[in-house]
Amino acid sequence: MTFKDLRDFIAQLEQRGALKRIQVPISPVLEMTEVCDRTLRAKGPALLFEKPTGFDMPVLGNLFGTPERVALGMGAEDVGALREIGKLLAQLKEPEPPKGLKDAWAKLPMYRKVLSMAPKVLKDAPCQEVVEEGEDVDLGRLPVQTCWPGDVGPLITWGLTVTRGPNKERQNLGIYRQQVIGRNKVIMRWLSHRGGALDYREWCQKHPGQPYPVAVALGADPATILGAVTPVPDTLSEYAFAGLLRGHRTELVKCRGSDLQVPASAEIVLEGVIHPGEMADEGPYGDHTGYYNEVDRFPVFTVERVTRRQKPIYHSTYTGRPPDEPAILGVALNEVFVPILQKQFPEIVDFYLPPEGCSYRMAVVTMKKQYPGHAKRVMLGVWSFLRQFMYTKFVIVTDDDIDARDWNDVIWAITTRMDPKRDTVMIDNTPIDYLDFASPVSGLGSKMGLDATHKWPGETSREWGRAIVKDEAVTRRIDALWSSLGID
């Protein structure tokens, strides 16, 4: 099932009983976080707050609060089907030459479909039904959440930031939080390694002192939102990938004040510029770590124009100690990552990002070990293959007899198959999330790899232990007798 815009997705969720309309007045200041947090932990529905206190614009929360809704937003009926999306991305990222004419013809429809998904640019769009410019711009009219008691102010969380570098044809889509600091100003908190920050840096080098155009789309369709957080190959735009998920081309419209193109069906679009050198202190805010982050300086985005639909819906979320919405998103996207990694490392059996590890800070890999040192090759591959794992601090690698998603299994492997000195890999001075205050330097820290595999000759001089295995005949006999024993 696919959805043409956010409103279509809301309607379909409501038909499935997966969305609840809240007509009791609830404040965007702290109260929505409490309601959404309780609902998410109960695996409850998406929430549409129709009467946010002090505002006449409804707020959509907990949209991706279950892995099933994430899968649905990506055009899949269940989480398991996300593996097929991962296989498609793996093939597009590392295409194999056809084995023959028959194989070439078999692959042709896939590549034809990719080529046919170039975005469609419209002249008029729903996101520009209402235009507010200059002195009419007032971000205070948006029901932006203040999520936690120690937050410094309102925070835009689900903004889809659109940028383009001066040397690139394709645009970059990224989701970066934005602190509202004035009627027409927000702080753009993008980390230095992210696409938007890299585009901005290149602009400043090529056009020193010149304002940098930026657009932020709020309330885009689910395929476009999720396309922005998926490991799309550099040769494929996020808009084209969203078209593949949706089954039809992404519709875009040119911004009123720049050449940037934004989703035509977005609820709200913020257009404006970043003036090089204009910076501000961002934070503190409660974050996905479960702590308030330290204050740091980031560029200021000046909003020159707000375009929107008639009676728009404001899409929002909160971040906190897992489980939160980004953690649930990570659980679902985990299934997309597995085939991509397996394409490069066929020996990988499973890959798991535990949500309690803040979605990306720890990874567990199970593999079919083939030679001494193999586990170390795999852990180094995880850190280097996808940008999404740049900030992963811990990689645990173990054998394929272990369930990567069962901590009982994983801990048993660590404690019985590891020698701390021999089997621990430490790498210093690597990129780390700036929100990770445990690192000694902001944005720079260490990584640890744990080799919890069986050790081969060359890795140990000792005879390796044999795992205890029950006698199958005895197990079958006790199965047959069990009901007569009166134990349960």
From Swiss-Prot:
<dbReference type="Pfam" id="PF20696">
    <property type="entry name" value="UbiD_C"/>
</dbReference>
<comment type="similarity">
    <text>Belongs to the UbiD family.</text>
</comment>
<dbReference type="Pfam" id="PF20695">
    <property type="entry name" value="UbiD_N"/>
</dbReference>
<dbReference type="InterPro" id="IPR049381">
    <property type="entry name" value="UbiD-like_C"/>
</dbReference>
<dbReference type="InterPro" id="IPR048304">
    <property type="entry name" value="UbiD_Rift_dom"/>
</dbReference>
<dbReference type="GO" id="GO:0008694">
    <property type="term" value="F:3-octaprenyl-4-hydroxybenzoate carboxy-lyase activity"/>
</dbReference>
<dbReference type="GO" id="GO:0005829">
    <property type="term" value="C:cytosol"/>
</dbReference>
<feature type="active site" description="Proton donor">
    <location>
        <position position="287"/>
    </location>
</feature>
<dbReference type="InterPro" id="IPR023677">
    <property type="entry name" value="UbiD_bacteria"/>
</dbReference>
<keyword id="KW-0831">Ubiquinone biosynthesis</keyword>
<feature type="binding site">
    <location>
        <begin position="189"/>
        <end position="191"/>
    </location>
    <ligand>
        <name>prenylated FMN</name>
    </ligand>
</feature>
<keyword id="KW-0472">Membrane</keyword>
<keyword id="KW-1003">Cell membrane</keyword>
<keyword id="KW-0479">Metal-binding</keyword>
<feature type="binding site">
    <location>
        <position position="238"/>
    </location>
    <ligand>
        <name>Mn(2+)</name>
    </ligand>
</feature>
<feature type="binding site">
    <location>
        <begin position="194"/>
        <end position="195"/>
    </location>
    <ligand>
        <name>prenylated FMN</name>
    </ligand>
</feature>
<keyword id="KW-0456">Lyase</keyword>
<comment type="function">
    <text>Catalyzes the decarboxylation of 3-octaprenyl-4-hydroxy benzoate to 2-octaprenylphenol, an intermediate step in ubiquinone biosynthesis.</text>
</comment>
<feature type="binding site">
    <location>
        <begin position="175"/>
        <end position="177"/>
    </location>
    <ligand>
        <name>prenylated FMN</name>
    </ligand>
</feature>
<dbReference type="Pfam" id="PF01977">
    <property type="entry name" value="UbiD"/>
</dbReference>
<feature type="binding site">
    <location>
        <position position="172"/>
    </location>
    <ligand>
        <name>Mn(2+)</name>
    </ligand>
</feature>
<dbReference type="GO" id="GO:0005737">
    <property type="term" value="C:cytoplasm"/>
</dbReference>
<dbReference type="InterPro" id="IPR002830">
    <property type="entry name" value="UbiD"/>
</dbReference>
<keyword id="KW-0285">Flavoprotein</keyword>
<comment type="pathway">
    <text>Cofactor biosynthesis; ubiquinone biosynthesis.</text>
</comment>
<dbReference type="GO" id="GO:0005886">
    <property type="term" value="C:plasma membrane"/>
</dbReference>
<comment type="subunit">
    <text>Homohexamer.</text>
</comment>
<keyword id="KW-0210">Decarboxylase</keyword>
<dbReference type="GO" id="GO:0046872">
    <property type="term" value="F:metal ion binding"/>
</dbReference>
<protein>
    <recommendedName>
        <fullName>3-octaprenyl-4-hydroxybenzoate carboxy-lyase</fullName>
        <ecNumber>4.1.1.98</ecNumber>
    </recommendedName>
</protein>
<keyword id="KW-0464">Manganese</keyword>
<dbReference type="GO" id="GO:0006744">
    <property type="term" value="P:ubiquinone biosynthetic process"/>
</dbReference>
<dbReference type="InterPro" id="IPR049383">
    <property type="entry name" value="UbiD-like_N"/>
</dbReference>
<keyword id="KW-0288">FMN</keyword>
